[in-house]
């Protein structure tokens, strides 16, 4: 089946995007929060 062949690639790509996006958004949120607290 073609689904079994494309499924792992799609999953790895999804994990890679979220693995990079989640820490980036979290770090941006923490940096902005620290700046708000300092002011």
From Swiss-Prot:
Listed name of the protein: Cytochrome b559 subunit beta
Keyword Electron transport: yes
Family affiliation: Belongs to the PsbE/PsbF family.
Described purpose of this protein according to its UniProt entry: This b-type cytochrome is tightly associated with the reaction center of photosystem II (PSII). PSII is a light-driven water:plastoquinone oxidoreductase that uses light energy to abstract electrons from H(2)O, generating O(2) and a proton gradient subsequently used for ATP formation. It consists of a core antenna complex that captures photons, and an electron transfer chain that converts photonic excitation into a charge separation.
Organism of this sequence: Huperzia lucidula (Shining clubmoss)
Keyword tags: Chloroplast, Electron transport, Heme, Iron, Membrane, Metal-binding, Photosynthesis, Photosystem II, Plastid, Thylakoid, Transmembrane, Transmembrane helix, Transport
NCBIfam families xrefs: cyt_b559_beta
Taxonomic path: Eukaryota, Viridiplantae, Streptophyta, Embryophyta, Tracheophyta
Quaternary context: Heterodimer of an alpha subunit and a beta subunit. PSII is composed of 1 copy each of membrane proteins PsbA, PsbB, PsbC, PsbD, PsbE, PsbF, PsbH, PsbI, PsbJ, PsbK, PsbL, PsbM, PsbT, PsbX, PsbY, PsbZ, Psb30/Ycf12, at least 3 peripheral proteins of the oxygen-evolving complex and a large number of cofactors. It forms dimeric complexes.
SUPFAM superfamilies noted in UniProt: Cytochrome b559 subunits
InterPro entries reported for this sequence: PSII_cyt_b559_bsu, PSII_cyt_b559_CS, PSII_cyt_b559_N
């Amino acid at each position: 089946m073609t689904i079994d062949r494309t499924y792992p690639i799609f999953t790895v790509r999804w994990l890679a995007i979220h693995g990079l996006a989640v820490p980036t958004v979290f770090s941006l949120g923490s940096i902005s929060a620290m700046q708000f607290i300092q002011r």
